[in-house]
Structures are given as C-alpha cells and as structure tokens.
C-alpha cells in the first residue's frame, strides 16, 4: 500500500490494570489499521529513560519512569495510511480533561498522570520508538485480507 507508515502505541500500566487492552486494540482494528507487533513487557528503567529522553529535564521525569515500571505495558506497532496522525487523534489530548468524548483518553481517563496510552507523535519518533521496543524480526509483515476493503 502506498504511503503506509508505522506507529508505536503503548498501553501504560493503568490501561493494562483496568483491562482496557482489548478495547484499545478493537478501536485500532476497526479503524482499519494492521497490527504487526505486540508484546506484554515489564519495561526496564533503562528502556524507559531512553524512550522518554526528551522529557529528562522535566520535573515529572523520575515519577513518570517509576510509574511506567509499576506494572506491565502492552507495546504495539500498527501500520496503515497516516497511522501516526490518525492514531494521535484517536488517543486524544495528553491531558484527558482536554480530550473529546470518543477518543481513548476522553472516554477512559481523568488525570494526565494516568492517561493509559502512549502514541508516537511523528513518523521519526515512531521509527525510533519501534527500534527501542522491538527487534526487527518481531515485526510481522503480512497482507490483510481486509486491505482491499479498506484502501482504494
């Protein structure tokens, strides 16, 4: 498919503990995106510090890393047309109070510190994040039988 891209989506410990994994996957599948990698992982401090390196000087950095280590994370790679931009719209605003109903955060979150999900904010960030969380052989390339019903 032309112009296809990949994004990294992570369901944070609060989303896993609240049993929202299936609902979140369902939304991405129903939109028409293709899941090409997924794993349940207890993220290490080193992985999280590298993932959030852009936030290292922020006052909440240490708490964020500690929180992300507090439970399992579901790491995923999704593929599709404009999946980075569309995925971010589906997630809603970082602060759930600013998120519209119908978005993941608008429907399931109250506080910014428990916003249940992370999504890459650019194609470049997605490539970096996918490389941090997955080995190349963990990405499964296949043709979905629904692809012709989703894309022209």
UniProtKB/Swiss-Prot annotation:
Q: What is its EC number?
A: 2.7.4.6
Q: Does the keyword Nucleus apply?
A: yes
Spell out the GO cellular component terms annotated for this protein, sorted alphabetically and separated by semicolons: cytoplasm; nucleus
Q: Please give one Pfam family short name.
A: NDK
- Description of how activity is regulated: Autophosphorylation at His-118 increases serine/threonine protein kinase activity of the enzyme. Interaction with the SET complex inhibits exonuclease activity.
Q: Which domain of life is it from?
A: Eukaryota
- Which residues hold ATP? 12, 60, 88, 94, 105, 115
Please give the cofactor(s) recorded in the UniProt entry for this protein.
Mg(2+)
Residue numbers annotated as active site: 118 (pros-phosphohistidine intermediate)
Q: Where in the cell is it found?
A: Cytoplasm; Nucleus
Which GO molecular function entries does the Swiss-Prot or TrEMBL record give? Answer: ATP binding; metal ion binding; nucleoside diphosphate kinase activity
Instruction: Locate residues linked as Glycyl lysine isopeptide (Lys-Gly) (interchain with G-Cter in ubiquitin).
Output: 100
Which residues are recorded with the post-translational modification Phosphoserine? 120, 122, 125
Q: Which PROSITE patterns match?
A: NDPK, NDPK_LIKE
Q: Which family does it belong to?
A: Belongs to the NDK family.
Designated name of the protein: Nucleoside diphosphate kinase A
- Where does this protein come from, organism-wise? Canis lupus familiaris
Q: What is the lineage of its organism?
A: Eukaryota, Metazoa, Chordata, Craniata, Vertebrata
The gene behind this protein is NME1
């Amino acid at each position: 498919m032309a112009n296809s891209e990949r994004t990294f989506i992570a369901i944070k410990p609060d989303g896993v503990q609240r049993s929202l994994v299936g609902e979140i996957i369902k939304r991405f599948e129903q939109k028409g995106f293709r899941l090409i990698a997924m794993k349940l992982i207890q993220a290490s401090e080193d992985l999280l510090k590298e993932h959030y390196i852009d936030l290292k000087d922020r006052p909440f950095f240490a708490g964020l890393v500690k929180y992300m280590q507090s439970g399992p994370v579901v790491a995923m790679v999704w593929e599709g047309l404009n999946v980075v931009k569309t995925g971010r719209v589906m997630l809603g605003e970082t602060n759930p109070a600013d998120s519209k109903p119908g978005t993941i955060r608008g429907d399931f979150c109250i506080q910014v510190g428990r916003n249940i999900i992370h999504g890459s904010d650019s194609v470049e960030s997605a490539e970096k994040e996918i490389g941090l969380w997955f080995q190349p052989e963990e990405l499964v390339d296949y043709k979905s039988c629904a692809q012709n019903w989703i894309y022209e």
